[in-house]
């Protein structure tokens, strides 16, 4: 792929986010666009976002970014608006990493494995994220920072939460999804107002979990240690005939 990827910042109800995010976005290798809720573009531009598109909610924003990137012959990078730190795993020397460096690592992972979706570990704690092997397959790809090659998969519009679990399985059961273990990211997440936090409740979590377990039998199980959370299972191996 010759075109540099589109970097899409997925945001809503956080109009000051560009002030911090622009420091990371400086190293993005291609165009950068903010995808926000209706009526928010002016506030985001006032805070430093240059290109802003109003598309509605979370899943609508994610799918609009995919459509725009693929129509331009680009891969799509999606990043949440509350990124706080990117760093290299100590196994490859440690230290701060730029967004462009991480995007390149995810792009290479897709090229080397044939996967159409790449991402990073869901935690920046190295105790839970060994760097060997460098790539992991059949595991959850958290949607906070992903690289998506042109492909037919889209985020499920029935989901307002946990849409990245569904998206991971879609890719995993097609060309593949790969997690790059050598880079780590941290996000403000649930301590940050706005975004999905504004409607994340235990009832909404339970509804999303039920939907996912019905749609993908055998691919998820409840997390016994964390109510309202699920764990992704590897696909069952087929028995030889």
Predicted regions and their residues:
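Short, well-formed alpha-helical segments that are part of the catalytic scaffolds
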Residues: 6-30, 38-46
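Short, solvent-exposed loop/turn segments at secondary-structure junctions
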Residues: 14-15, 41, 82-84, 123-126, ...
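A structural signal for short, well-ordered beta-strand segments and their strand-loop junctions
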Residues: 34, 76-79, 116-121, 178-182, ...
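Active-site-proximal specificity loops/subdomain of glycosyltransferases
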Residues: 35-79, 84-99
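Conserved catalytic core of nucleotide-sugar-dependent glycosyltransferases
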Residues: 86-169, 241
């Amino acid at each position: 792929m010759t075109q540099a990827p589109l970097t899409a910042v997925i945001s809503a109800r956080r109009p000051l986010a560009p002030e911090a995010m622009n420091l990371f976005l400086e190293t993005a290798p291609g165009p950068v666009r903010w995808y926000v809720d209706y009526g928010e573009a002016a506030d985001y531009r006032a805070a430093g976002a240059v290109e802003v598109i109003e598309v509605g909610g979370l899943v609508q924003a994610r799918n609009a970014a995919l459509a725009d990137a693929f129509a331009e012959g680009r891969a799509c990078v999606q990043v949440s608006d509350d990124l706080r730190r990117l760093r290299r795993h100590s196994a490859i020397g440690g230290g701060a990493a730029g967004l462009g460096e991480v995007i390149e690592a995810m792009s290479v992972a897709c090229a080397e494995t044939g996967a159409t979706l790449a991402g990073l570990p869901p935690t920046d704690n190295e105790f839970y994220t060994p760097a060997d092997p460098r790539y992991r397959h059949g595991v959850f790809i958290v949607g906070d920072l992903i690289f998506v090659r042109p492909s037919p998969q889209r985020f499920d519009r029935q989901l307002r939460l946990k849409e990245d679990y569904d998206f991971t399985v879609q890719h995993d059961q097609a060309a593949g999804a790969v997690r790059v273990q050598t880079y780590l990211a941290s996000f403000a997440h649930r301590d940050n107002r706005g975004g999905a936090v504004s409607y994340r409740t235990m009832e909404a979590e339970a509804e999303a979990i039920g939907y996912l377990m019905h749609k993908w039998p055998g691919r998820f199980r409840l997390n016994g240690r964390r109510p309202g959370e699920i764990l992704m299972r590897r696909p069952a191996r087929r028995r030889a005939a």
